[in-house]
Amino acid sequence: MLSTLYQNDLKKKRNRRRNRSAALVCCPQKEGSVLKPRIVTPKKPNSARRPVAKAKLTNKKFVVAHIPGTGHNLRKHSTILVRGGGCRDLPGVRHTCIRGVSDFLGVRDKTKRRSIYGIKRPPEMAKRVRRKFRAIFGQ
């Protein structure tokens, strides 16, 4: 049987996938400025005080972004870089701030998982230079 035009239109709409971080508009990250850093509580089975920041992105959209790690230095008008992917138990939080970029400092005294928390390699963890290259690199 032939389908009507309305039925064809329904089939097209059904296949579309919802974009979870629509505010980024096909970009991996966007820069923005903090409007209000605050603390929110998670959904029912969990109990905590999670820091989030309401931010205005460079494309004039407003998002609520999760602040990862312990402690932060964000104030009003701080510049942050935001990526997709929020906190599962915080409703309405669909983005995450990236640490160690622009005004947002990395977590202090962190040695493991440094790339997540924006920390450079400390000098005591420097790579060992192979013997045949020591003359070149001066070690």
Curated annotation (Swiss-Prot):
The record's listing under InterPro entries reads: NA-bd_OB-fold, Ribosomal_uS12, Ribosomal_uS12_bac
Entry keyword Phosphoprotein:
no
GO cellular component terms listed in the entry, alphabetical order: mitochondrion; small ribosomal subunit
Q: Where does this protein have compositionally biased stretches of type Basic residues?
A: 11-20
Q: Does the keyword field hold Metal-binding?
A: no
Which stretches are annotated as coiled coil?
A: none
One of its GO biological process terms is:
translation
Swiss-Prot/TrEMBL keywords: Mitochondrion, Ribonucleoprotein, Ribosomal protein
Provide the residue span(s) of the region labelled Disordered: 1-21
SUPFAM superfamilies tied to this protein: Nucleic acid-binding proteins (SSF50249)
Q: Where are the transmembrane segments?
A: none
Gene3D superfamilies in alphabetical order: Nucleic acid-binding proteins
User: GO molecular function, one example?
Assistant: structural constituent of ribosome
Q: So what family is this one in?
A: Belongs to the universal ribosomal protein uS12 family.
Protein name per the record: Small ribosomal subunit protein uS12m
Please report the organism this UniProt entry assigns to the protein: Paramecium tetraurelia
What is the gene called? RPS12
